[in-house]
Regions:
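Asparagine-centered strand-capping/turn motif at beta-strand->loop junctions
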Residues: 120-128, 133-152, 209, 289-291
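Serine/threonine-rich, repeat-prone extracellular segments and beta-strand-based repeat modules
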Residues: 37-62, 66
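Short aromatic-acidic-glycine turn motif
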Residues: 79-85, 140, 150-167
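A eukaryote-biased signal for short, well-structured alpha-helical docking elements
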Residues: 70, 74-108, 226-264
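Intrinsically disordered, low-complexity Pro/Gly/Ser/Thr-rich segments with frequent PxxP/GP/PP motifs
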Residues: 162-198
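Solvent-exposed, low-complexity, repeat-rich "mucin-like" stalks and linkers
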Residues: 18-42
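Terminal connector regions
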Residues: 197-233
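Short, solvent-exposed loop/turn segments enriched in Ser/Thr/Gly
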Residues: 51-56, 124-131, 199-203, 280-286
Length: 291
């Protein structure tokens, strides 16, 4: 992996519709781009093909109603989940995609949320669509909190990773996210990104189940008009389990002396057998005590 990247997607249709579409949002401050993204998703899930205009940020405890293409949407503030994210998923093996294929298929439950880091490049001669979806194989409704951001498609694979990370960190620091309801047997598409040849997409996604049993996370790439790849063609990247994906580091600096701070430690085993150095997808907080 060349960058601290991020991204995702997968195909789905779903008979999922609210009588009055409602967008449930969490966060001390929900950035304008995420308000727009969450509202756009709810419209799509309700079968409404229209673009949501640029939005104002959503302040703490603030709700409002949007009128988009003749449809009223209610933005409702809700509390963020108590569950922790303890599983790190890396979708970067393969990094280069040349045809329709599955990239990640993973089941998770209430015992630990997931953080997906993804970074992929279209090396085919035509267009490719990258999809991310959540599906509920159970017999009861599943409620899932998601917080995700992406960047691209662009040609600069270093730049796209940094932009995606910056956008996601704005959500992370504010606990900004969207609470979604997945009916039994239902699927919801979270993201679809269309890449031209040589373009790259990158992104991060956190998902925590607040109610229900296991939920499936899928990432796949398809050529326009082609069916979703069979499950047996998926090649998962590595999955790491931690007590926490947040690390606190405290060090003391004494005037007149030098101090070295290191970021990332440990050697992870990538799915292709190669070693990667560093702690991709983890948050490090440094406290420097001056004496």
């Amino acid at each position: 992996m060349r960058v601290a990247a991020i991204f995702t997607a997968c195909v789905l249709g779903l008979a999922w519709a609210q009588v009055t579409p409602e967008v449930w949002l969490t966060g001390s401050l929900v950035p304008p781009s995420f308000v727009q993204q969450a509202a756009q998703r709810v419209l799509y899930w309700n079968g409404i093909q229209t673009n949501v205009p640029v939005q104002e940020p959503l302040e703490p405890g603030q709700g409002r109603t949007l009128s988009v293409g003749g449809t009223d949407l209610t933005l409702t503030p809700v509390a963020p989940p108590n569950g922790r994210v303890t599983q790190l998923l890396l979708s970067n093996d393969p990094e280069n995609i040349s045809a329709t294929r599955g990239l990640f298929h993973y089941s998770f439950g209430q015992d630990g949320g997931v953080r997906l880091v993804y970074h992929h490049k279209n090396t085919s001669a035509g267009m490719l669509e990258l999809h991310i979806r959540l599906s509920n194989p159970g017999s009861l409704d599943a409620w899932v909190w998601v917080s995700d951001a992406n960047a691209g498609p662009v040609a600069d694979e270093i730049f796209v990773g940094h932009v995606a990370t910056k956008r996601w960190l704005e959500l992370y620091w504010n606990r900004a996210g969207q609470l979604i309801q997945i009916p039994p047997g239902g699927q919801l598409e979270l993201t679809k990104l269309t890449m031209r040849p040589a373009q790259v997409v990158s992104g991060l996604l956190e998902a925590v189940i607040t109610q229900g049993q296991n939920v499936l996370l899928d990432v796949c790439a398809t050529a326009p008009g082609e069916d979703e790849p069979p499950l047996e063609t998926y090649s998962n990247g590595p999955v790491y389990r931690f007590g926490s994906l947040e690390t606190q580091v405290s060090q003391t600096y004494r005037a007149g002396r030098s101090l070295q701070l290191s970021l990332g430690e440990g050697t992870f085993q990538a799915g292709n057998g190669k070693k990667i150095r560093g702690s991709w997808g983890q948050i490090y907080t440094y406290t420097l005590n001056l004496t």
